[in-house]
């Protein structure tokens, strides 16, 4: 999920050294957030920082890129596809290098998503500087990492219900990567988790199919605040309601014409919640 073999699209190869250097958004390191409330507020600040300052920088880059592409004299493929993409890039933020196809674009209704990974995967993220999607699908949820009423074991269980092609362990719930949803994500599965108080919590999952080797902007990363799995200990008092980081319902495959369809179900797989 965080890395894959190096592959380059035909569009990327076409531009070659003529590509402009895309601005880099340094993901916010939230590993030192001491509690769930602090993590919530620091996450909100990180998303606000991307929206308020970096989006303008990205659009300036994309318009310069588009101008360069549209001035190219070649008309054959893949240059003609680059020109089609360039027109789109003058209007919508793209979360990765614009030389890749299909484009993964910002949604009109923003939604914050979280991809849960092990500490080892976070180290790879720090090394790569960006979230690299290669040969595996990216499995994300709108369930936030500060949800301390949910246990690591229960979160691993519902991840395995949502995506049975990869075995998720409790250690994969130790860390999170915060990103924006985008046009290549499709609404996939809604699981029912049970929190440490015995209450049911709906967990929506979204899938972005493997797209070849491309890197994506990461807004923030850090340690989750999910509960330990021991049930014999005395339960903590239920936390007061958190601010909701979700800015809209999960995107469906029909929300944007740029979404490229649902992943294919494997044998015995179902999207009906257990």
Curated annotation (Swiss-Prot):
Pfam families (alphabetical): RolB_RolC
Segments of this protein annotated with the region Disordered: 248-274
Keyword annotations from UniProtKB, A to Z: Plasmid
UniProt family annotation: Belongs to the rolB/rolC family.
Role description: Contributes to the root inducing activity.
Identification of the protein by name: Protein RolB(TR)
Organism in which the protein naturally occurs: Rhizobium rhizogenes
Lineage, highest ranks first: Bacteria, Pseudomonadati, Pseudomonadota, Alphaproteobacteria, Hyphomicrobiales
